[in-house]
Amino acid sequence: MKYLLLLLLWLPGAAPAPLAPLQIAEQFVAPTGWAPMKDYLCCEVAGQAKTQTLGQQIPAPLRRTCELVQQGTATAVVAVELRDSASRRDFYLHFQRDTAGWKLAAIRTLAMTHLGPPMVALLTGLPPAEIASYNRKHPDASHAFTVGNLRLWTSADADIAAYFHHHQPDFQKLLRRVQAGKFFAAAPGPNEPAAEAAANADPAVHTLLRRLFLGRVTRRATNCSSCLAFVIGGKTTSTVGLLYQPRPAQLPAMAPDGIIVLRPLGQGWYLYKTA
């Protein structure tokens, strides 16, 4: 009987061994190939990864670190950091669970961040006279703010988290000012744009936003009416920022076409990115 069981395990068509999302992610981003890859893919990724894993398409010298961000009964998210001596980049692997087990369904990252470094290089290369001219033309977003904001927008998750912790007293001060102003006291409705405009125009709020290189405060960036989102920046609907929601039960769910990652920073704060 023991030998018959071993034989069955080797027969063609045998069910793949069940793997957890983190295990699948580690295999999928490893620099070597992964023969049973297709058994663990579904949805859009099944059509994208036809012959190579993501790891085979990434330059071999890059270090790859996988971290489980969330795992429920039906969905899971694993963050992948790619790193070398000069840079870091983050991807997010979204999983679904079906009757056969966990499958990798979608891969997401913050869009258009490649635009940031050339813009920073251009701005930091301006001579003093042109910087002064820039500041006159952009009184609400100075040269120093724009450079700092662009750098923060294109930073790796680990660097944004470190930035938040280093400046947490100012983030808490900004939060208290927004809450004290009661700009978002009413439920979201037709007056939401006016409430948001009033919050961002408040002198104390505006000063702290600019000091922290933040673009704006809003409730609309993450479609969470009970959350405050302090947006760093982004393009179209692909944004990054810091979200505040002290009640975990009210956090929005992560999804490939919504919030692609939500990473806890402590005391009700989260780093978020949208698709």
Where are these predicted regions, by residue range?
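Short, aromatic-enriched amphipathic alpha-helices that serve as compact interaction elements
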Residues: A17-P36, H167-L175
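N-terminal domain-onset segments
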Residues: S142-R220
